[in-house]
Regions:
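Structured domain cores in non-transmembrane regions
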Residues: 48-91, 160-183
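Short loop/turn motifs at secondary-structure junctions and domain boundaries
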Residues: 7, 108, 374-377
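Broad, structure-driven detector of short, well-ordered beta-strand segments within folded domains
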Residues: 21-28, 113-118, 229-234
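Beta-strand-rich N-terminal accessory domains
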Residues: 1-60
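Long luminal/extracellular ectodomains of secretory-pathway precursor proteins
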Residues: 78-81, 102, 118, 125, ...
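Solvent-exposed loop/turn segments at secondary-structure junctions
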Residues: 23, 31, 43, 98-101, ...
Length: 522
């Protein structure tokens, strides 16, 4: 049976795109995703929510000179709708919001073009957005931007984000007063009277499902009703995310909510809030990301959908950069460049021979100082890992001027290239051997832990038994349990940790986080 072509249906207040597998409905001209029909489910999105609270791009912004990470929350609504591509193989539509001086102090001074793409035979849809600030516009700060989907709570109960991080989650109702007890911050709630008693006594906290950018390429939800259905957020590249590969961001959490976070100050603070001045021109493409839908045959284990989503993620990664986005602001592979070389560590106190940078992190980022990539949040970054011999290839880099940055697990400090590297379309640059000399004043006398930027080797205590997420019991991510900061003073009531070199074991004797003590006043 031939695969039917993609059809576009335009109405006064809605736009519907149908490829025979799914029907995607968006408000016109707002560009809010109001409906996703798939596999005989009329709408995967939460139908009890207002249409503007189902699938949307949003941001948090503030006036120039403001400090902190808060500001005005804005669900981005378009003011004009345009058809960019309408063919049997592809439909791409645009919902644009233009800024004018009459909107000063009311809206963030950005032109925002939200795009949605449906392809023939494709079980899902793509979205990306183009943000542009013109040179003569006023300044602003941008604390956050993301794409959010609110799924049906009566359907999607099983969340998966990694092979060892997946579980049934409670209902959003369980977080409300009477069923949930607020804890130290609003996101953390103790479930005292949940609708389903098996969740009683658990802590629900969306931050417990955060993930490093480098590890957050697919996450989402499974509806276990037969036939089972999955909804997945696939991020095929990290080039448009801020903060580098070890920046943590939110993923999926109780709602059921699924996020693609492009820019966020979570876990970092104001350093990761870009500040734009008057007279500063800026443009950035966030995405595309892929919302993948899959279904299981009757009788199949619904968790198979997670395995299938991982396979699809691999396909999307291999397809990057996509060939089909119509915007000229998204360069295709032949409009990008490539960099290759080898990273070597030179440390005579470890070895008289050069040391291959085994599984080091190396990336191109905007010009700056060593380590500045961690705070860079306006432009693009391109990261990869070296192999066991230190060799690396960074493919499909946007044209421009960059510094090359790196760090190597097992060695302290940051590498930075001495000179700028200019990437040009279609050009491959071979930089040869790069030498990194870690900073030191002499031989290592002693050290606590392993310099790999994870703290995974240190002592993580068991949580208070009253505040447990069962997912993280005896788990590599047990540091995500609620309230561990309070355990420090309980374990060391008379003073801070005393670590004795040569006797103490950092796996047992060094608390994984440096936290303040609670001061009690009677």
């Amino acid at each position: 049976m031939p695969i039917i072509g993609v059809q576009l249906h335009i109405q006064d207040t809605h736009v519907m795109i149908d490829n025979g597998i799914l029907q995607l409905t968006l408000s016109n001209p707002d560009g809010i995703v109001t409906g996703i029909r798939y596999n005989d489910i009329d709408n995967l999105l939460e139908v009890v929510n207002e249409e503007s609270n189902r699938g949307y791009w949003d941001l948090v912004w503030n006036s120039p000179g403001s400090t902190g990470t808060t500001g005005s929350f804005d669900v981005i609504k378009g003011t004009s709708f345009n058809v960019i591509v309408e063919e049997e193989d592809q439909v791409e539509v645009s919902f644009n919001r233009s800024w004018g001086s009459s909107q000063e102090s009311k809206l963030v001074p950005l032109n925002i073009d939200k795009r949605f793409i449906v392809l023939r035979g494709c079980s899902g849809f793509y979205s990306y957005a183009i943000f542009e600030h013109l040179k003569d516009w006023p300044g602003f700060t941008l604390a956050e931007t993301r794409l959010a989907f609110k799924l049906r709570k009566d359907k999607f109960r099983y969340m998966a984000m990694a092979d060892n991080r997946q579980r049934y989650l409670p209902l959003p109702d369980d977080r409300l007063p009477g069923r949930g007890q607020a804890l130290a911050y609003p996101e953390a709630v103790l479930l005292v009277n949940p609708v389903e008693p098996q969740f009683k006594g658990e802590v629900d906290d969306k931050y417990q499902y955060s993930c490093d950018n480098k590890d957050s390429q697919v996450h989402g939800w499974i509806c276990t009703d037969e036939p089972a259905v999955g909804f997945w957020m696939i991020t095929p590249s990290n080039e448009f995310r801020s903060g580098g590969p070890v920046k943590q961001n939110l993923t999926s959490h109780v709602g059921p909510t699924t996020l693609a976070v492009f820019l966020s100050a979570h876990y970092s603070g104001e350093d990761l809030v870009p500040k734009f001045s008057a007279g500063e021109a800026w443009k950035k493409v966030f995405g595309p990301v892929f919302m993948y839908l899959n279904s299981a045959m009757e009788g199949e284990d619904p968790v198979w959908l997670w395995e299938d989503a991982k396979q699809q993620m691999g396909i999307e990664v291999e397809s990057w950069p996509y060939t089909f986005p119509a915007s000229d602001d998204f360069p295709k592979s032949n409009q990008r460049g490539k960099l290759s070389g080898r990273l070597i560590v030179k440390d005579r106190y470890v070895s008289h021979e050069n040391i291959a940078a085994n599984r080091g992190y190396i990336g191109l980022g905007p010009p700056g100082n060593a380590g500045s990539w961690q705070r860079e949040c306006k432009n693009y970054q391109f990261w990869t890992n070296t192999d066991v011999n230190g060799y690396f290839v960074i493919n499909d880099v946007r044209a421009g001027d960059y510094n090359l940055y790196a760090w190597v697990p097992g060695f302290i400090g940051d590498y930075q290239s001495a000179a700028l590297i200019t990437i040009a379309p279609g050009i491959e640059i071979e930089v040869g051997d790069l030498i990194y000399e870690p900073p030191r004043n002499g031989p290592t006398l002693w050290e606590i832990g392993i310099p790999d930027r994870s703290a995974a080797e240190f002592y993580v205590p068991d949580p208070n038994s009253n505040y447990i997420n069962p997912l993280y019991v005896n788990h590599p991510h047990r540091f995500r349990q609620y309230g561990l900061w309070e355990r420090y003073a309980e374990l060391y009531p008379d003073g801070d940790v005393v670590y004795t070199v040569g006797t103490s074991d950092y796996k047992k004797d060094w608390f994984f986080a440096q936290v303040t003590r609670q001061d009690f006043v009677f």
